[in-house]
A protein has these predicted regions:
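Acidic, metal-coordinating helix/loop segments flanking the phosphotransfer/catalytic sites
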Residues: 36-54
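A Lys-centered signature of the CheY-like receiver
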Residues: 108
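Non-catalytic signal-transmission and effector/linker regions of two-component phosphorelay proteins
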Residues: 1-11, 17-18, 24, 39, ...
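Active-site residues of response regulator receiver
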Residues: 58, 86
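The feature encodes the CheY-like receiver
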Residues: 62, 90
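Acidic catalytic/metal-coordinating carboxylates
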Residues: 38-39, 65-68
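Short amphipathic alpha-helix used as the core "switch/output" element in two-component signaling
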Residues: 67-78
Length: 125
């Protein structure tokens, strides 16, 4: 039986193509393998849940929201460290996300280094 390496993939879920591409490029520029999805449902339908080490997810998405995705993954016993990003810094939503296990909640626009520090911390989980 082969020993499985710890997953290192950073999955990015954001419906804004510019944000998605920028975050994907940022992750790859520092050596993190990354894959971007436009919708939560696209990520769920992919075969990448098991090798995802960190999720960067927009709170507000068409269809399933970022919080709904977090809830579904928790219900399916996936424990993927999740960093939420949003243009709407609602404290109630922030607390809900953190109580459900999010490792960070960043309000757009955010500093690239703040996001990278959060990703590095998530990969250490």
């Amino acid at each position: 039986m082969a020993i499985r390496e710890k997953p290192q993939l950073v999955a990015i879920i954001d419906d804004n193509e510019l944000v998605r591409n920028a975050l994907n490029g940022l992750m790859k520029s520092v050596g993190f393998p990354a894959l971007a999805f436009a919708h939560a449902e696209d990520f769920l339908a992919s075969d990448r849940k098991d090798d995802t080490a960190c999720l960067i997810v927009d709170i507000r998405l068409p269809g399933m929201s970022g919080l709904e995705l977090q809830s579904k993954l928790n219900a399916e016993r996936y424990r993927i460290p999740t960093i939420f990003i949003t243009a709407h810094g609602d404290e109630t939503v922030r607390m809900q996300a953190l109580r459900a296990g999010a490792v960070e909640f960043l309000t757009k626009p955010f500093d690239d280094e703040a996001l990278l520090q959060s990703v590095r911390a998530a990969l250490e989980c």
